[in-house]
Each structure stands twice: as structure tokens, then as C-alpha cells.
UniProtKB/Swiss-Prot annotation, chain B:
This is Proteasome subunit alpha type-4-A. The proteasome is a multicatalytic proteinase complex which is characterized by its ability to cleave peptides with Arg, Phe, Tyr, Leu, and Glu adjacent to the leaving group at neutral or slightly basic pH. The proteasome has an ATP-dependent proteolytic activity. It is found in: Cytoplasm; Nucleus. The lineage of its organism: Eukaryota, Viridiplantae, Streptophyta, Embryophyta, Tracheophyta. SUPFAM superfamilies: N-terminal nucleophile aminohydrolases (Ntn hydrolases).
Length: 203, 250
């Protein structure tokens, strides 16, 4: 499958008035590793992040298109997009290419106006799937489901959430040949954004 | 028979003039004025808002100052509905450039693309030209801080200090006298306010009638576009002594 060409693992979790989004750092071409510092998670603005799993070239192009559309929204409305609005935008852009889709599965995480966290994922043609606890995508998604299912607790504070998402990510990518080589974690609270780079099994 | 060369924009008069374009410029001469001044550490834009009625709900956002991209802003004089169309195309152009080349659009290129649009309306189809003059303030890595002025014909030029709208000739000549090449941004603001007091119809400046915006570099070398709030504008007006203490109104 073309979704498994480069390998990826993306996960987002909700905490108490905060959220975390994390991804692996590997860029491969099937079983050969090309880079170990690939960015799959991008900041849209201070309160909304998007992680894109799937084909790396489409990940970058889709992100650039989203920046384009978000920037025009910012200029016209003189405010940032709400996470729910942004998710609908991503969904609409993906569905535009219904019969020749961007080969990525997005994970969107953000904080709303009342500091309420929002997470969602969708398939490559924009069918939204909302969740209250965690969302996963990428080649490691099956093992991520298991790890998150076992480790997740509701209403975690930022530090505990970081620990949980990191452990879930690292243990999952060890069970997947195509993702791994450390991790990239963002913890977003109403007041600050923490960005951390994880070392895992670097092989 | 002067109507003969008026009705279509695409026709030259025997004297070699395009009347519709000249009428468009005339329309701008009645609009609230805007002044732009280049200084060594930034660009200052100031605009006069025409208060048509006190019953009119004033909009919360700036009326004459528009951000085009993170590094470019513009001030408008003329027909606002025409301006909105052009501002929208300018914003889309800037984002298209960024999407294509992953870097901010050079300021002059942006001004040029907008002026190409304006020019098109003076030549093709039985349409009227845009009744808008712009002042563009921006920064790019090629030429640093820049100030451009454009008119309905699609002409543009880079300026150290420029004025558009009502009384622009008077403003221009004061600017010519008092502009200093090594002025700081603060001095540029002072000069802009001074010019506006002299060219505006009303005697005293108040924050309701003005809009002030600046484009400058932050210490971390990112471009910042800042529109002053009415409060900070009032402070500036008092500081530079261009406002009279509030007159009693019955």
C-alpha cells in the first residue's frame, strides 16, 4: 500500500485543559531509512496542530495548502481558526480530491476558546472521526490503538500526559518495522507549548 | 461633445488623455487621505477616517489599513468596495507565491501584480477602472523597508514619503520640505501627524478620526505589522501636542 511507503506513526491525546500530539521521526523508502528527522506534525497556530501520516510528499503538499487557506482566513477574519473549523477545512480539501486523493491520514488536535481540547482524525478522503480520548494513524496505528487503550486515563495533567503519550508511542513503534527512530512530542496547554524530541530504539 | 471620449475607458481623447482614468483619480481626491513615511527602522502609515454620521456603527477593525501578508500592509484612499476586491486579490497573490516558493513574496512584485490588475481595467472591455489609490508599506530581504504608492491607472513608484486622497498635493509639499533621510520611526510618526493636522479640514485631531499603523522589525528580525489602538493613539497625539484638550460640547 502506498500509505506504507514511507512509514509513519501519529497519535494525539486529550488531557485536562490540554492535549498532546506526537509522531515518529523516520522517513523511509519501504525498508530503507532515508532520514531520521522528518517532521509530520506542524503548528497551524498557537492552539491548533496537525499531524499527517502517510506518503511524505503528500504530507508536505497538503500542509502547504492548509497554511495557504488558513492564512487567508486569518487575514479576512482577523482571528485564528477554531479547531473544529480547521478540521472541516481539512476534510473539505481532502474531499475535493475524492478520486485522486492526498495519500495521508491527518490527525488534528487543538484547544477551543474555552480551553476545551479537541482531537479528531480522518481518512484520506476527509471522513471525520471525532474522539474524546485519543486518536491514532499511520503504519503503527494498530499497535498504537493497543498501547493507548492500555495506558490512557481521562483528565491527565500536562506532565503525566507527556509521559503517557511518549510511552505509548515508543512501545508501539518498536512493534512496527516502518516507523520509529525516536519521537517528536508537543504538549499544548492554554499558556504554553512544550516541544520535546524523544530518543528510542534508534535502529 | 466632450462626452465623446468619456463613455469608454479604452479610448484616447484627441489630446491623448484617458478621461475615465482621470475621473477615477478625481474620485480619490475627495476620499479621506492617507500618508506613508519611510524611516530607517520602519514604515509608518497614517489614515484619515471620514466620520459620515455619528449614528454609523464604527467597525471594530481598521477601516483604511489592511494587512496583505505578514510583511506587507497597505493604506487605502478611494472607493472602499473597489479596494476590497483588490486587497483580496493581493492577499491571494501573496499566499500563492508563498505556496509556490516557500518564502514571502517580494514587496515590489506584489505591488506590480496588483498594478497589472489595475492597468487591465484601463484598457480592456467596457469596464471602469478601480477608483483606488494605495500606499504599500513592507519589508523584504532584497530591499529592506519599502513604501510604494499606486493610482487607478496602474502606475506605481517607490517613495520616501507619499500622500494620497484629499489634499494630497498640500501634504506632499509639506513632506517634501520636512522629510529627513535619517529620521527614526518615532520621528516619522510625528511628521505624519503634523502633516495631517495641516491638511485635514477639522482643526484638532482625535483618535476617532485617525488610524496609525507601523511596519518594523522586532529584535528577533521578524517583520511586525502593528495598528495603534485608539488609546495609544490619543497618547501619541497628546505627546506631540497636535490635539486640543477635549472641547466642551453641549
Amino acid at each position: 500500500s502506498i500509505f506504507e511507503y514511507n512509514g509513519s506513526a501519529v497519535v494525539a491525546m486529550v488531557g485536562k485543559n490540554c492535549f498532546a500530539i506526537a509522531s515518529d521521526r523516520r522517513l523511509g523508502v519501504q525498508l530503507q531509512t532515508i532520514a531520521t528527522d522528518f517532521q509530520r506534525i506542524s503548528k497551524i497556530h498557537d492552539r491548533v496542530f496537525i499531524g499527517l501520516s502517510g506518503l511524505a510528499t503528500d504530507v508536505q503538499t497538503l500542509y502547504q495548502r492548509l497554511v495557504f487557506r488558513h492564512k487567508l482566513y486569518q487575514l479576512r477574519e482577523e482571528r485564528d481558526m477554531k479547531p473544529e473549523t480547521f478540521a472541516s477545512l481539512v476534510s473539505a480539501i481532502l474531499y475535493e480530491k475524492r478520486f485522486g486523493p492526498y495519500l495521508c491520514q491527518p490527525v488534528i488536535a487543538g484547544l477551543g476558546d474555552d480551553d476545551k481540547p479537541f482531537i479528531c482524525t480522518m481518512d484520506s478522503i476527509g471522513a471525520k472521526e471525532l474522539a474524546k480520548d485519543f486518536v491514532v494513524s499511520g503504519t503503527a496505528s494498530e499497535s498504537l490503538y493497543g498501547a493507548c487503550e492500555a495506558m490512557y486515563k481521562p483528565d491527565m495533567e500536562a506532565e503525566e500526559l507527556f509521559e503517557t503519550i511518549s510511552q505509548a508511542l515508543l512501545s508501539s513503534v518498536d512493534r512496527d518495522c516502518l516507523s520509529g527512530w525516536g519521537g517528536h512530542v508537543y504538549i499544548v496547554t492554554p499558556t504554553e507549548i512544550k516541544e520535546r524530541i524523544l530518543k528510542g530504539r534508534m535502529d | 461633445m466632450s462626452r465623446r471620449y468619456d463613455s469608454r475607458t479604452t479610448i484616447f481623447s484627441p489630446e491623448g488623455r484617458l478621461y475615465q482614468v482621470e475621473y477615477a483619480m478625481e474620485a480619490i481626491g475627495n476620499a479621506g487621505s492617507a500618508i506613508g513615511i519611510l524611516s530607517k527602522d520602519g514604515v509608518v502609515l497614517i489614515g484619515e477616517k471620514k466620520v459620515t454620521s455619528k449614528l454609523l456603527q464604527t467597525s471594530t477593525s481598521a477601516e483604511k489599513m489592511y494587512k496583505i501578508d505578514d510583511h506587507v500592509a497597505c493604506a487605502v484612499a478611494g472607493i472602499m468596495s473597489d479596494a476590497n476586491i483588490l486587497i483580496n486579490t493581493a492577499r491571494v497573490q501573496a499566499q500563492r507565491y508563498t505556496f509556490m516558493y516557500q518564502e514571502p513574496m517580494p514587496v515590489e512584485q506584489l505591488v506590480q501584480s496588483l498594478c497589472d490588475t489595475k492597468q487591465g481595467y484601463t484598457q480592456f472591455g467596457g469596464l471602469r477602472p478601480f477608483g483606488v489609490s494605495f500606499l504599500f508599506a513592507g519589508w523584504d530581504k532584497h530591499h529592506g523597508f519599502q513604501l510604494y504608492m499606486s493610482d487607478p491607472s496602474g502606475n506605481y513608484g517607490g517613495w520616501k514619503a507619499a500622500a494620497v486622497g484629499a489634499n494630497n498635493q498640500a501634504a506632499q509639499s509639506i513632506l517634501k520640505q520636512d522629510y529627513k533621510d535619517d529620521a527614526t520611526r518615532e520621528e516619522a510618526v510625528e511628521l505624519a501627524l503634523k502633516v495631517l493636522t495641516k491638511t485635514m479640514d477639522s482643526t484638532s485631531l482625535t483618535s476617532e478620526k485617525l488610524e496609525l499603523a507601523e511596519v518594523y522589525l522586532t529584535p528577533s528580525k521578524t517583520v511586525k505589522y502593528h495598528v495603534h489602538s485608539p488609546e495609544s493613539l490619543t497618547k501619541l497625539l497628546v505627546k506631540h501636542g497636535v490635539t486640543q484638550p477635549a472641547a466642551e460640547t453641549s
